[in-house]
From Swiss-Prot:
Family from the record: Belongs to the CinA family.
Protein name: Putative competence-damage inducible protein
Length: 409
């Protein structure tokens, strides 16, 4: 089967939004043996979209579109696809009720514009969207298949995984199962180097690394004629990867780093408090994402100024004067100070130069220290990163969580 991915949206052409959808879909299709022959990006224009569909179906069996399913007048993907397949748009009552219910969650009422999102080609399979107001759909006609998906990745990806992949698996006459391993502490290129033998010799299962800020995921995907056989194919490859990467793997599936840490803290009844400077509360914010953390997370303090470090955390004035706020000595005193003043087993701190100003030759932008206090023992980690302010702050949080995880083992 040959496929084209067609991403719709003037905002993509203008560069206002990065097109991550095509990359995601291409990787998923490759895992099930569907060849992607072409990527296209076009603006919100019906005539252009019709021409692109005509061109794509000249050599492809399958076209997947993203975007253009919103409530505004320039969202024209659905109308264009219906016209291409010579289908009338009809109101789908179930979708209308689901859209109305979702709008009520945000204290919004149904409008005529939103009602437009409940119209679909008469002969199609509708794909529910629990994460937004734009359902997708699949239409088959004259040996042509079009899969129409919403543009926002947080809506498109769950729909693709839960609805589209099972549909495509039936077309390819095999069962596909995947397992995701979550890795932090080493980058994607390091992961690829360490498991290069596996990546170079892979056939079935396939192993695909994906990178995001501070983390790498490995998706192991196996194909077989039954679910049991597919899962059994994954087991030896996963075992081999775990032996190589060891504790750089922090979890699997949908598990987050903060969830892993929270489970350790709750299970061992270890209380924690945070003292943050350069991350400004982001670290505490990550930890409290876990719903059961309230029993062990006692306090989060943002101590940005030297005065607050002295008054709130009992950091010594002499330490600040001798080493400056961005130093391992201050990071350690911050961690110990928050733990002792809060009465917790663990204190963790961040201090650094996030930029864009404030850097010096000795203390450049991207220099960060993470301090850790665990039941009387102290640990410190130095980081050096390049990037903008938000990147440095976010990567510091990920590294701080990983530093804590490794020292809790």
């Amino acid at each position: 089967m040959k496929a084209e991915i067609l991403c719709v949206g003037t905002e993509l052409l203008l560069g206002d939004i990065v097109n991550t959808n095509a990359q995601y879909i291409s990787k998923e299709l490759a895992n099930i043996g569907i060849e992607v022959y072409h990527h296209s990006v076009i603006g919100d224009n019906e005539n252009r979209l019709l021409k692109e569909l005509e061109r794509a179906f000249n050599y492809c069996d399958l076209v997947i579109t993203t975007g253009g399913l919103g409530p505004t007048k320039d969202d024209l993907t659905k109308e264009s696809v219906a016209k291409f397949f010579q289908e009338d748009l009809v109101l789908h009552e179930k979708s209308l009720k689901q859209i109305e219910k979702r709008l009520l969650c945000f204290n919004k009422s149904m409008t005529e514009s939103n009602k437009k999102q409940a119209y679909f080609p008469k002969n199609c399979e509708i794909l529910e969207n629990p994460n937004g107001t734009a359902p997708g759909f699949i239409i088959e006609k004259d040996n042509k298949i079009a899969i129409i998906l919403p543009g926002p990745p947080y809506e498109m990806q769950p729909m693709f995984e839960k609805k589209v992949m099972p549909y495509l698996e039936k077309l390819t006459n095999c069962t596909i199962k995947s397992k995701v391993l979550r890795i932090t502490g080493i980058g994607e290129s390091d992961v690829a180097d360490l498991i290069s033998d596996i990546l170079e010799s892979q056939t079935n299962p396939t192993v695909a690394p994906y990178a995001k800020q501070g983390e790498t995921t490995l998706r192991i995907t196996a194909k077989a004629n039954s679910e049991e056989k597919a899962l059994n194919l994954i087991v030896p490859i996963e075992k081999k990867i775990r032996q190589i990467l060891e504790d750089n793997i922090y979890g699997s599936g949908e598990t987050s780093l903060e969830e892993v840490i929270a489970n350790i803290l709750v299970k061992r009844n270890l209380t924690i408090a945070t003292a943050e400077s350069c991350t400004g509360g982001l670290l505490a914010g990550k930890l409290i994402n876990f719903p059961g953390i309230s029993s062990v997370f006692l306090e989060g303090a943002i101590t940005y100024s030297n005065e607050s470090k002295i008054n709130r955390l009992n950091v010594k004035k002499e330490t600040l004067e001798k080493y400056t706020a961005v130093s391992k000595e201050v990071a350690l005193e911050m961690a110990e100070g928050i733990a002792k003043s809060s009465g917790t087993n663990i204190g963790i701190s961040t201090t650094g130069v996030a930029g864009p100003g404030g850097g010096t030759y000795d203390k450049p932008i991207g220099l960060v220290y993470i301090g850790l206090y665990i039941n009387g023992k102290t640990f410190v980690k130095e980081l050096n990163y390049s990037g903008n302010r938000q990147f440095i702050r976010n990567i510091t949080v990920t590294r701080a969580l990983d530093f804590l995880r490794r020292n809790l083992k």
